[in-house]
Amino acid sequence: MLVIAGLGNPGKTYENTRHNVGFMAIDELSKEWNIELNKTKFNGLYGMGFVSGKKVLLVKPLTYMNLSGECLRPILDYYDADHEDLKVIYDDLDLPTGKIRLRTKGSAGGHNGIKSLIQHLGTPEFDRVRIGIGRPVNGMKVVDYVLGAFTKEEAPHINDAVSKTVKACEASLTKPFLEVMNEFNANV
């Protein structure tokens, strides 16, 4: 089984914010793979289906970003999945807007959602797709920036990044993640 989680915050208020790009990617995967997000359990919204012969679980934690591990640990336990079965999609301030980077492990890098996951999983070793949202300018506070909407100029870059994320997730169904990582990171 493959568990793909997109991190974000629940509710209309946060729907199109930079911090919710993980949710945006899950929504796109849901459409692309025809997996309806129709179950709520473990403080998450999720759906299951088969893609390229593999069982896939798409998850949007509803715990708010900073508590994402409180949703994903119980889901992994319930479905008898391990951290090696998990792919996490989330926003990254340290990447330029619209760029993606894949990683097989690493620190939280200041991202509280990832910090929560590492804490609840007991390991930093899980696959990640980081989507760049850039850094705030003109003295804007980070919290205001990540909870702000994408500008008209940023939107096409984010849409492109979400499309690339879908392609990377699709590739990871049939290839080892390390190979997918090398392929997609080379094209960044």
UniProtKB/Swiss-Prot annotation:
TRNA binds at residues 14, 64, 66, 112. Disulfide bonds: none annotated. The record marks 91 as: Stabilizes the basic form of H active site to accept a proton. One of its GO terms (cellular component) is cytoplasm. The record marks 9 as: Discriminates between blocked and unblocked aminoacyl-tRNA. Keywords: Cytoplasm, Hydrolase, RNA-binding, tRNA-binding. It is found in: Cytoplasm. It comes from the Bacteria. Pfam families: Pept_tRNA_hydro (PF01195). InterPro entries: Pept_tRNA_hydro, Pept_tRNA_hydro_CS, Pept_tRNA_hydro_sf. Its EC number is 3.1.1.29. Belongs to the PTH family. Monomer. This is Peptidyl-tRNA hydrolase. It comes from Bacillus velezensis (strain DSM 23117 / BGSC 10A6 / LMG 26770 / FZB42). The lineage of its organism: Bacteria, Bacillati, Bacillota, Bacilli, Bacillales.
